[in-house]
Design a protein with these regions (language model features):
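Conserved acidic
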Residues: 1-175
């Protein structure tokens, strides 16, 4: 029943979101980047190498990386120190902001949605994961304005670990 699920979620500290809240977070999820790039390296006579296509990125991220735990804290008013904290990745969660990329970046970091996923060098407003904002700032993006921050005090690396182990075991047994 519903109460049983709510108790399990509380016990595991998994947040229960309303539809409106889920829609806000969904703005930060864009799917994977797909584009054609030519990888070129001229080997010297004594060198050898190999190209490895990584197709298991999602399981690796789910196994090793941090996920939010518990309920978020919402910020709507900001001081200068909040801009610095966002830039340094001190808020773990989601950031709604106006951001300006540098003009000399070959591979823009932050996408926006049109008919397709677009990575451009235009100033834009959007909701992104805090680690994406930190990476963008490391590459020269400038936060123009903060509108909303939803961050989590607690994180865990164990949210999907058992799930990935289980599917990896099935995959290995069937190969």
């Amino acid at each position: 029943n519903n109460q049983t699920y709510k108790n399990i979620f509380r016990e595991k500290k998994i947040a229960i979101f309303t539809f409106k809240e889920a829609e806000w977070f969904r703005q930060a999820f864009f799917g994977g980047r797909t584009n054609a790039m030519k990888l070129l390296y001229h080997f010297k006579k004594e060198e050898c190498g190999a190209y490895i296509d990584i197709t298991s990125l999602y399981p690796a991220v789910n196994f090793y990386d941090l996920y939010p735990k518990g309920h978020y804290i919402k910020l709507l008013e900001f001081k200068e120190e909040d801009y610095i904290k966002v830039k340094n990745g001190e808020y773990f969660g989601f950031i709604d902001c106006q951001i300006k990329p540098p003009k000399n970046l070959y591979h823009p970091v932050l996408p926006h949605k049109g008919d397709k996923l677009i990575f451009d060098l235009l100033e834009k407003r959007g909701v992104w994961c805090s680690n994406e904002i930190k990476k963008a700032c490391d590459l020269g993006y400038e936060i123009i304005e903060l509108y909303e921050i939803r961050y989590f005090k607690e994180q865990t690396k164990n949210l999907f670990k058992d799930y990935v182990k289980w599917f990896l075991k099935i995959k290995q047994q069937s190969s």
